[in-house]
Amino acid sequence: MNPAWALLRLASPQLPIGGYSYSQGLEMAVEQQRVNDQASARRWISDQLLLNLARFEAPLLLAHCQAAADQDWARLQQLSEEHRASRETRELYQESRQMGYSLKQLLEGLPELDSDARELLTHQDEPHLALGWALAARAWGISPADALAAWLWSWLENQLAVLMKTLPLGQQAAQRLTSELLPLLQQAQHHAANLDPNHHGSAAFGLSLASMAHERQYSRLFRS
């Protein structure tokens, strides 16, 4: 089977885990006029990529995928607990939990998941997204590096979809923005892959504040 198909499957917006329901604070940034055009949108996404994802979320996800590939189940469980504890707001916690639960439901019904991974997943009451993503990558024969690339692409694609729904930003403008951001996506992946685990961490105060404010946003399209 063509290995690209598995990668496209993992990165697809049709993966039934509800990622389209969440904006990760971007909807509130638009509401507050911090993001109001293509330039400010590029700045917001760039900052999230290089100051948050590249320094913490991406290396943590990569570590999940590597532990799953190595069948280091104790390490994977430890990383999952760290991921769960690192969610800074209620909405970000609920987002990761809901998407992880949906991925668990999907994987449990598929034949590709091996018995050891299935047993680990079965005993997870609240599997978060990173754990499910790592097990999906293992089940579909996707390398940790490619699984991280798929996750970063899915994140970027979702952020652009949010912008097209909340700003006067059309599909062609979104594609131009994609061209501008792809080098940063590559930069984030490279940084995550080479970062010392002792230096994993970020201080994304703007994201946290936007996420907390979104809980009280009067009219909204997204759940985070």
From Swiss-Prot:
Q: Does the keyword Secreted apply?
A: no
Q: According to its UniProt record, where is this protein located?
A: Cytoplasm
What InterPro entries has UniProt attached to this entry? UreF, UreF_sf
Which Pfam family, an example, fits this chain? UreF
GO molecular function terms noted in the UniProt entry: nickel cation binding
Task: State the GO CC annotations.
Answer: cytoplasm
Q: Which UniProt keywords apply?
A: Chaperone, Cytoplasm, Nickel insertion
Domain of life here? Bacteria
* HAMAP family in the cross-refs: UreF
Q: What does this protein do?
A: Required for maturation of urease via the functional incorporation of the urease nickel metallocenter.
What subunit structure does UniProt give? UreD, UreF and UreG form a complex that acts as a GTP-hydrolysis-dependent molecular chaperone, activating the urease apoprotein by helping to assemble the nickel containing metallocenter of UreC. The UreE protein probably delivers the nickel.
Name the family the entry cites. Belongs to the UreF family.
Full protein name: Urease accessory protein UreF
Q: Native species of this protein? A: Pseudomonas fluorescens (strain ATCC BAA-477 / NRRL B-23932 / Pf-5)
Q: Highest lineage ranks of the organism?
A: Bacteria, Pseudomonadati, Pseudomonadota, Gammaproteobacteria, Pseudomonadales
Name the gene behind this protein: ureF
